[in-house]
Regions:
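Conserved N-terminal beta-strand and adjoining loop/helix that marks the start
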Residues: 1-17
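Short connector loops at helix/strand junctions that flank enzyme active sites
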Residues: 4, 12, 28, 33, ...
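Conserved Nudix-box catalytic region and its N-terminal flanking loop in Nudix hydrolases
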Residues: 13-54
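Short clusters of small/polar residues that mark proteolytic maturation junctions
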Residues: 22, 70, 96-97
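Nudix hydrolase/Nudix homology domain
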Residues: 26-31, 93-146
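A short coil-to-beta-strand element that immediately follows conserved catalytic motifs
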Residues: 58-68
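Active-site-adjacent beta-strand/loop module that shapes the phosphate/pyrophosphate-binding cleft
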Residues: 69-91, 101, 105, 124
Length: 146
């Protein structure tokens, strides 16, 4: 089975999380965290920086590892490194996605997450249950206006 490595970013604004709806391909209309495939020789961190610049038009600062998701789709295995990050420059633009939405923690399941991204949402929920809202989001980046 083919294996694909991707990097994804969880971007927060207070207790809201940015979700993006795919606009193309097999998973069109599914919701995901922004990010994409690693290029040859690229680390997951480098891919996250590049993908957020390309997809959202923003520059990010330091990355904090959140989780790694291993998920078997019908035709490939996905290995997804997920990070929280801080936007240090730029304003989020809708460049490649059908739609984007800020979801507060009470409405995380209001969109139809892609299966691998469901695992990330579950990790966020566990973090909330174990640490409480304030501590769970302490490492989650805030959107900074430029």
């Amino acid at each position: 089975m083919k294996s694909i490595k991707v990097a994804a970013a969880v971007i927060c604004d207070g207790d809201r999380i940015l979700s993006c709806q795919r606009s193309y391909g097999e998973f069109k209309d599914g919701w995901e965290f922004p990010g994409g495939k690693l290029e040859p020789g690229e680390t997951a961190e480098q891919a996250a920086v590049r993908e957020l610049r390309e997809e959202l038009g923003v520059t990010i600062g330091s990355l904090e590892h959140l989780c790694t998701v291993e998920y078997d789709y019908d035709t490939f295995h996905l290995s997804m490194e997920c990070f929280t990050c801080e936007i240090v420059a730029g304003t989020i633009e809708e460049r490649v996605h059908e739609n984007m939405a800020w979801l507060d923690v009470a409405h995380l399941w209001d969109v139809d997450w892609l299966p691998a991204d469901v695992e990330v949402v579950k990790q966020l929920e566990q973090r909330l249950a174990g640490e409480g809202r304030a501590r769970a989001f302490k490492d989650c980046a805030q959107v900074k206006s430029s």
